[in-house]
UniProtKB/Swiss-Prot annotation:
NCBIfam families: PRK12325.1, proS_fam_II. It catalyses: tRNA(Pro) + L-proline + ATP = L-prolyl-tRNA(Pro) + AMP + diphosphate. This is Proline--tRNA ligase. CDD domains: ProRS_anticodon_short, ProRS_core_prok. PANTHER family: MITOCHONDRIAL RIBOSOME PROTEIN L39/PROLYL-TRNA LIGASE FAMILY MEMBER, PROLINE--TRNA LIGASE. InterPro entries: aa-tRNA-synt_IIb, aa-tRNA-synth_II, aa-tRNA-synth_II/BPL/LPL, Anticodon-bd, Anticodon-bd_dom_sf, Pro-tRNA-ligase_IIa, Pro-tRNA-synth_IIa_bac-type, Pro-tRNA_synthetase. The gene is proS. GO terms for biological process: prolyl-tRNA aminoacylation. It is an enzyme of class 6 (ligase). It comes from Acidiphilium cryptum (strain JF-5). Belongs to the class-II aminoacyl-tRNA synthetase family. ProS type 2 subfamily. Pfam families: HGTP_anticodon, tRNA-synt_2b. Homodimer. Disulfide bonds: none annotated. One of its GO terms (cellular component) is cytosol.
Length: 437
């Protein structure tokens, strides 16, 4: 993408309404623009980040055996009355009426709708288990939206659901999804810690939140440093081996981890002192097991092996995709701007032409741009070198390929790594090889 033809409106000054780092940098780097309280338009570079995060989520959900679906955003109030949540949910749920005066709602979550779909589609225990998910825009009318995309009213979210014949199967699905989430966050280049959580309005008796560690996080967190070295690869844990899932879950839940709200000083004292870590965290996901709460309320049954009708056991699993964007910036930035992890960066590299209009530098930049394709943002603007450097640091792509007239004359470029700040003068092929890794 050529920056001269792109809608990436960077800002030199910090907007007054931005209170935290991620909000300031997302506005300044041209990722989003606010449309109303807690509602944002995602501009091209921001949307690329959303897509990169969502694609990692999709790949890890597929590995875990979950199927992607897409449900409507507008739901019938009758479904929520079946479960008893229509009146109980609270004012954060947007209630509307259509032209025929039928009560509808903008779904903040989808337990009811998917239970109804399963009720109409699944009749026998032979059709279970099922795991399904979607990635969709949602709306919750926060009383005081703030902190940019971390506490918005409209947000992009992955919500998943499992249906099992019995408790043992439901627990296996829960553990499978916990492993999938930990692998998802690791691929995104961030460290996440699972912590026991309240179930809130979704209900149930088992839940874990996933917190990304960030100096500016909203919650205080206490955790065992052994979380930092847990191996999550296929060699360590196989989704199809129940013993592996049990071992993974036992390992995760045997280590101390708690937010300040649930911190237990007596349990914390039992953690070896050299393994105690304190910091701040941002919640980016939560998983729930709630048994037959919805299948009973909505009369969803299947015929069991003995011919008796049974209510399937359920779980639900959420990841805040748009929230992750802000959380990752909170965890990965410096005074100059964003430092994107490789896997989710909008571009792998910024190409900086320091002598726009010079035949040699222009030709070399075009060669690099053609070689990197859609992974590169080519700063071909008629702008000062200092402005280009500042914007490249602000936008935070992993690599900067700097092309000046002296290096270009020798067929060389300067390659800067955004995270470390390391610079090296390299020939074109060597620079491209590093960027492509």
């Amino acid at each position: 993408m050529r920056l001269s033809r792109s809608l990436i409106p960077t800002l030199k000054e910090t907007p007054a309404e931005a209170q935290i780092v991620s909000h300031r940098l997302m506005l300044r780097a041209g990722l989003i623009r606010q449309q109303s309280a807690g509602i944002y338009a995602w501009l091209p570079a921001g949307l690329r980040v959303l897509h990169n995060i969502a694609n990692i989520v999709r790949e890890e959900q597929a590995r875990a055996g979950s199927q992607e679906i897409l449900m409507p955003t507008i739901q019938s109030a009758e479904l929520w009355r079946e479960s008893g949540r229509y009146d109980a949910y609270g004012p954060e749920m947007l209630r509307i009426r259509d032209r025929h005066d039928r009560e509808m709602l903008y779904g903040p979550t989808n337990e009811e709708m998917l239970t109804a779909i399963m009720r109409d589609s699944v009749q026998s225990y032979r059709d279970l288990p099922q795991m399904l998910y979607q990635i969709q825009w949602k709306f919750r009318d926060e009383v005081r939206p703030r902190f940019g995309v971390l506490r918005g009213r409209e947000f992009y979210m992955k919500d998943g659901y499992s249906f099992d014949l019995d408790y043992e199967g439901a627990v296996e699905s829960y553990r499978r999804m916990m492993l999938a989430y930990m692998r998802t966050f690791k691929r995104m280049g961030v460290r996440a810690v699972p912590m026991r959580a309240d179930t809130g309005p979704i209900g149930g008796n088992l839940s874990h939140e996933f917190h990304i560690l960030a100096p500016t996080g909203e919650s205080g967190v206490f955790y065992d440093s052994s979380f930092e070295t847990i191996e999550l690869g296929d060699d360590a844990y196989d989704y199809e081996a129940r013993a592996d899932l049990d071992a993974f879950f036992d390992r995760m839940t045997s280590l101390y981890a708690a937010t300040d709200e649930k911190h237990d000083e007596a349990a914390w004292a039992k953690v070896p002192e050299d393994r105690r870590r304190e910091g701040r965290g941002i919640e980016v996901g939560q998983i729930f097991y709630f048994g037959t709460k919805y299948s009973q309320a909505m009369n969803f049954t299947v015929v069991g092996p003995d011919g008796a009708r049974l209510h399937p056991e359920m779980g639900s699993y959420g990841i805040g995709v748009s929230r992750l964007t802000g959380a990752i910036i909170e965890a990965s930035h410096d005074e100059a701007g964003i430092i994107w992890p490789d896997a989710i960066a909008p571009f792998r590299a910024s190409i900086l032409n320091l002598r726009q209009g010079d035949q040699v530098t222009d030709a070399l930049c075009e060669r690099i741009y053609d070689a990197l394709g859609r992974d590169a943002l080519y700063d071909d603007r008629e702008a000062r070198a200092g402005e280009k450097f500042a914007d490249a640091d602000l936008m935070g792509h992993p690599w900067q390929v700097i092309v000046g007239p002296r290096g270009a004359a020798k067929g060389q470029v300067e390659l800067k790594h955004r995270r470390t700040g390391e610079r090296a003068e390299l020939d074109i092929e060597s620079a491209l090889a590093k960027v492509r890794v």
